[in-house]
Amino acid sequence: MKNKLQITLTTILLCCSSLIAQNNQISLNSGYTNQSFFSMQNGEAQNIPNDDWDLAFSTDAFSSSIRINDGKGVELYTYHLGDTSSWNNINNSTPNILINPMYNSDTDWGYGAFDTNQTGGFDYGWGVYNLQNHHIIGDSLFLIKSINGNWKKLWLEKKVSGEYQFKYANLDGTNEISQNILATNYADKRFIYFSLDNNIVMDREPISSEWDITFTKYITLVQGMPYAVTGVLSNVGIEVAQADNVSSPLNYTDYTAHNFEQTINTIGYDWKSYQGSYVVDPNRCYFV
């Protein structure tokens, strides 16, 4: 049986100062294997598999954010016993001593799992910004469990003029691969993706201006613990307001009574609850 999310969207079209109600059904397929990008004006922009990539590199010239497919099972750890000179010290037993898994932010696209250890200033978590040549130089090693469950060691070596340079290998050092991704070639997208097991760059998003929200799996804190949920994240610059305790959500149009936020998980996952099957909150709506 397919897992489907049926949503009712009330869209604010500022160009014509009117409210339009639309009924749309989004399918993420059995096991929530897909991701859907949705435009309030044009409907579903893209529906694609979400279980075939590991890394997502920001294409923004002023961002160094790198995210992982944590909602679908990718795991990331810093190698805490040494710096980049310790590449050859990592081996097949290293996963047994790993601590503190890292996750993407679910409130800001600009803060990925690889950015977790940043200390502020010119430290970006996975690397340090060089004021003289404007390069970001990788100063950390990582261990990553791919979407297919394979462990790799990874060094994000640098970002230079919009190009990410990195290498990865099996934990025993075999099958070492060096890769370059020129993110500026995909500037009209939010991220450019990469599969570690297949060693391929993946252009899988619609153009950034062509979607407003995405239905996907991601990690969030549930009762203080990181947990994979299925929910809705909004695009950069999209403002969302939540209205609760509404007796007739389909007919409710007073968006001015609510605060709009650009936090990407404003819609999030908690508009539904599990009661043997998922039940949508009948007294909540959102304005986008």
Predicted regions: what they are:
Residues Q22-V288:
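Surface-exposed, beta-sheet-biased, low-hydrophobicity segments with strongly acidic/polar composition
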Residues M1-Q25:
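Bacterial Sec-dependent N-terminal signal peptides
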